[in-house]
Regions:
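Generic structural signal for small/hydrophobic residues in well-ordered secondary structure
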Residues: 25-26, 48, 66, 86, ...
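Active-site phosphate-binding strand-loop segment of PLP-dependent enzymes
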Residues: 115-174
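Short active-site oxyanion
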Residues: 55-56, 84-85, 136
Length: 174
């Protein structure tokens, strides 16, 4: 029997900032009257919305901020209360879980598929059977791979609110 270790390396990203990008950023910093909510941000939001085929886009300082605003908006719109249960992936970014905890909701961790890093549907079924009071599920579409949202809806039913983080899957289709 071989004791040879098998290591797989998955690069998360490559440096894609060109010299031209750096020059443009330096010029912007030197000449801009303001760094946030300026005309370039508005233009980018409009172009991004058009590319996505949606009505509005809102750009914020980070993915952490985006997730906090997203969960806060969902909590208010769907009247989630302190202690309400939200299913989250057991392997994900901390910024998918921290806003749930910051806003007083209870994360329920679901195992993930080792290939897609999306929810393991067998474990999701187990959680749905054990917790009849689940209010939401926070889905992360990782590495450009769209999660099987239809399967999750079939398991959880129409009363569960779906929250989706697609920061790693812009342009992916399902």
């Amino acid at each position: 029997m071989s004791t040879q270790e098998h290591k797989t390396f998955w690069p998360l990203m490559k440096d894609c900032i060109t010299a031209e990008d750096k020059t443009a950023m330096i010029e912007f910093i030197q000449n801009a009257g303001r760094f946030t909510n300026g005309p370039m941000v508005k233009k980018f939001e409009q172009e991004w919305s058009k590319w996505l085929g949606c009505k509005h886009s809102l750009f914020v300082s980070s993915g952490s901020t985006a997730n906090l605003l997203l969960v806060a908006a969902i909590k208010e719109k769907y009247n989630l209360k302190e202690g309400d249960k939200v299913i989250v992936p057991a392997i994900t970014w901390v910024t998918n879980i921290s806003p749930i905890m910051q806003l007083g909701l209870q994360p329920i961790f679901c195992d993930v598929d080792p290939v897609t890093f999306s929810f393991n549907t067998n474990h999701l079924k187990t959680l749905a059977a054990a917790h009849h009071d689940i209010k939401a599920i926070f889905i992360s579409h990782l590495f450009g791979i769209s999660a099987d949202v239809d399967a999750y809806k079939a398991i959880l039913g129409p009363k569960v609110t779906f929250i989706e983080d697609v920061c790693e899957s812009h342009g992916a289709t399902y």
